[in-house]
């Protein structure tokens, strides 16, 4: 199981280094799936959008999106984050990603390999 992001699927301005790395994750996943399939080893990846973790939910991010506020918080960042999603949520929760990983690792997905599963509240649709 590999973890990419929505950046594995599309370009985002001013983040070429990040996008290149995340596209690489998807390429590795596909190569591993082809190479290891003969041994019945499945390889997949999950691709979240903004996740409610310290990596996203921090003062630097809040100030990046709300430089006009002295002490912006999550509630100030939420409208900007939600604009990137099709579903009306500003971010996904870590357990949403975990649940996708559990599905892909389970017998319920025993014939699923080489799949990049977005957990992105519809961000890739925009």
Predicted regions, residues:
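Short C-terminal tail/terminal secondary-structure segment
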Residues: 10, 101-102, 113-126
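Active-site helix of classical SDR
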Residues: 21, 29
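Conserved SDR Rossmann-fold cofactor-binding beta-strand/turn motif
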Residues: 42-52, 105, 118-120
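Short, flexible catalytic-loop segment of classical short-chain dehydrogenase/reductase
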Residues: 48-58, 62-67
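A conserved structural motif in NAD(P)-dependent oxidoreductases
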Residues: 74, 85-97
């Amino acid at each position: 199981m590999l973890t990419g992001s929505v950046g594995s699927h599309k370009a985002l301005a001013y983040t070429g280094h990040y996008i290149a790395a995340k596209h690489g994750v998807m390429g590795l996943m596909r190569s591993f799936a082809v190479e290891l399939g003969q041994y019945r080893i499945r390889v997949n990846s999950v691709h979240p959008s903004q996740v409610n973790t310290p990596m996203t939910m921090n003062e630097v991010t809040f100030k990046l999106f709300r430089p006009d506020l002295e002490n912006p918080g999550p509630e100030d960042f939420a409208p900007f984050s939600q604009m990137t999603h099709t579903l009306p949520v500003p971010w996904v929760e870590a357990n949403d990603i975990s649940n996708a990983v559990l599905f892909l690792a389970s017998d319920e997905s025993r014939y699923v390999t080489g799949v990049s599963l977005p957990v992105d509240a519809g961000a890739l649709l925009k």
